[in-house]
Amino acid sequence: MPWNSEHTNWFFKIETNLKSKDGKEVCLLEYNYDLNDKTVLSKWAKHFRNHYCFDSEIDFLRNGTGLSRKDFLVQLKFPTEARGFGSGIRSGDFSEILVADYLEYILGYWVPRTRYGNKTIRDESTKGTDLIGFKLYDENKTTKDVLKMFEVKAQYSGNKAKPRLQDAIDDSIKDDLRKAESLNAIKQRLFDKGKTEEALKVARFQNQVDMPYTSEFGVAALYSNDIYDEDVIINCDTSAHPYNSALFLIVIKGDDMMKLVHKLFEIAADES
């Protein structure tokens, strides 16, 4: 399998009493990546690339285009680096995948990777809930099983921090309404890839009335350190969220994050 988790070792939890305006605790993480660690970056780039196009499928998909693997990815699959909305889509995709990795490899959820490979327009974001993670305890389909819906927002440029955590909270309010469509999309993409067993895991969560489980919600904001502002975080308010008691708040920050975003896309293409 192409997946790898070594880059999640660069997460460091900052001990803090950070809370929202209404008293919800905020988990604060520093992402201390190392651009000199070529081994980890290479494994991460492969992991990242396979969200857009599996290495096992790229030669078939590029057949007829006259493009090399690198050019196929750069010209047809990856969001553009500078044109139009491309840079913003790059940062958004990167941030969602990084939070998915934290959710899966640090917090222990299963997060299907189906969101980016079937884009029709590469410089557009995929509709629906940003991330869905699952915990299944056994085959008995107990109420302990967990479905966690996550919204992710990022800001890696600008002179002033925007309320990205509040934006994620506001978007998360709609997640329960989008759940059925998002689950169906994940299940269908898994089935289309021949991953029937994984598709059936998703099916377990499609009828909460007859097969109850625990619903959780999460929101994440990611910033570059040069614009991160704690005051913006503590002014966010979750009180309007209908599932406030089941809401997890996380902020991830790191140095020059947009540089990292572009570097990862570059390595992913170069090493394809």
Residue ranges of each PLM-predicted region?
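Nuclease-adjacent, charged terminal/linker segments that flank catalytic cores
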Residues: M1-K70, K77, F265-S272
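Charged, often glycine-rich, active-site loop that binds/positions anionic groups
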Residues: L73-L76, A82, D123-G133
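A short, highly charged nucleic-acid-interacting micro-segment common to nuclease
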Residues: F78-A100, T120-R122
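Conserved catalytic cores of phosphodiester-cleaving nucleases, focusing on short active-site segments
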Residues: L103, L131-G133, K148-A154
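Short, solvent-exposed loop/turn segments that connect beta-strands within catalytic domains
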Residues: Y137-D145
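Charged, structured surface patches that assemble and position nucleic-acid processing machinery
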Residues: K201-S272
